[in-house]
Amino acid sequence: MTIKSLELETVCGITSKLPQHDKIEMAFWGRSNVGKSSLLNTLWNRKSMARISSQPGKTQTINYYNINDLCYMVDLPGYGYAKISKEIQAKWARMIERYLDTSNALRVVFLLVDIRHEPTAKDVETYQMLFKKGFNPLIIATKADKIKKNVRNKNISKKFLTNFKTYDKVMELCQTRTRRTLTNKQ
């Protein structure tokens, strides 16, 4: 898809009401600092539309990006490590749960996982929770440009396919630094 217009249209915090609209939504979710915002910037061919940081927990709101006035790409706060209190993390979790449970426009959830490491228990738990909620999450393996190709292929077969047993879709390998997306059919 050629992006002709891109706008951060809605930002929802912990107590915000979620927007009602008639466009489809695609959500991007994963552990804190997994590269969600970097991936979005790469997909959009923009350097800093979605704010990025080396500090985990930079995205603290649900951010709705309007693409060509046709759909929304939704950047969700990461789960796991962040330099915030457990209380705030619990509020984020409830905010995301509310979004997943109430958005009638959400069609797909892209679950981002760092390919350099084995998926965490929280990654697997999140994947299973999405299935229980009726979603068929598409896993995107991020940070592929930070490891060698042979290690990357080994990690897919050993770490990813073992941990995501019900997963039979296309695994996307993303290299945001080189702006390349590689497809590896399993």
Regions found by a protein language model. Give the residues of each.
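Nucleotide-state-sensitive switch-loop elements of NTP-binding domains
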Residues: 79-101
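Conserved C-terminal guanine-recognition region of P-loop GTPase G domains, centered on the G4
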Residues: 71, 93-168
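Canonical P-loop GTPase G-domain recognition
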Residues: 2-17, 145-186
